Design a protein with these regions (language model features):
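Short, glycine- and small/hydrophobic-rich beta-strand elements in well-ordered beta-sheets
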Residues: 1, 106-118
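DNA replication initiation on ssDNA origins
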Residues: 1-76, 84-92, 181
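Short, structurally constrained coil/turn elements
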Residues: 6, 109-110, 176
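DNA replication initiation modules
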Residues: 43-45, 58-98, 130-205
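Short amphipathic alpha-helical segments
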Residues: 95-107
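Glycine-centered loop/turn motif at secondary-structure junctions
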Residues: 105-110, 162, 166
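Residue-level signal for beta-strand positions within conserved beta-sheet cores that form or flank
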Residues: 112, 121, 181
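Short, conserved phosphate-binding/catalytic loop or strand-edge motifs used
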Residues: 116-131
């Protein structure tokens, strides 16, 4: 994930929990050389209260690049519902959106998600698969195509429900279809409005 530190960004690619519960983070620098940083759990918690993102996919350790060719596995369909107009009453619009979505879930118009985050100015909706999909195994080509097709239709379905309900201030962001997409980490602050990203729904089934 990325986080700001002294005004810049540091990119950590892999995380390992050590036997003593410390956390080891492998950092890729600009010249793709590895650097290793260690955090205690409390130090990591402190870091995670900052401006942090996490990738939806895992990446191969070829050169540390967050690019399509470097994607290793995908296991999440993420729907990003955003409010871009800063003049809009964000909470009122999101409450209205939540009612529409709840009705859609209850009436089987949409599959119930794994988790929903309030991102500060929108909703981040996660569908986490039971098994990840490898990006490089040739035998899984049809599975990958099916994943992409279902994912695109899912995002379109969210947008069509918003349109049908007359909600014009919230939009489904189709940029989430990018394999290298980053999403905000729950518990961190959205610097655009100072609000904390919170998990507001978690499917326990």
């Amino acid at each position: 994930f990325f986080h700001d530190k002294r005004g810049g960004y540091i990119k950590y690619a892999n995380a390992y929990i050590l036997p003593n519960d410390d956390i080891c983070m492998e950092q890729f620098t600009a010249d793709t050389q590895d650097e290793v940083c260690f955090f205690t759990p409390m130090e990591m918690f402190s870091e995670l209260t900052k401006h942090c993102y996490v990738s939806l996919a895992t990446f191969q350790k070829k050169d540390g690049a967050r690019r399509d060719f470097n994607v290793f596995n995908r296991s999440i369909m993420y729907v990003d519902l955003d409010i871009h107009d800063t003049a809009v009453d964000c909470e009122a619009v999101l409450n209205q959106t939540a009612l529409i979505l709840t009705d859609a879930y209850n009436n089987n118009q949409l599959p119930i998600p794994t988790m929903i985050n309030h991102t500060g100015r929108g909703l981040g909706i996660f569908y986490i698969l039971e098994h990840s999909i490898n990006e490089s195994v040739p035998e899984l080509k049809k599975t990958r195509l099916a994943f992409d097709g279902i994912y695109k239709r899912l995002v379109k379905k969210y947008q069509s429900l918003l349109d049908a309900a007359g909600i014009t201030d919230v939009h489904a962001d189709f940029a989430v279809l990018d394999k290298t997409r980053l999403v905000r980490v729950a518990g961190t602050v959205n610097p655009n409005n100072g609000k904390v990203c919170n998990t507001i729904f978690r499917n326990e089934d």
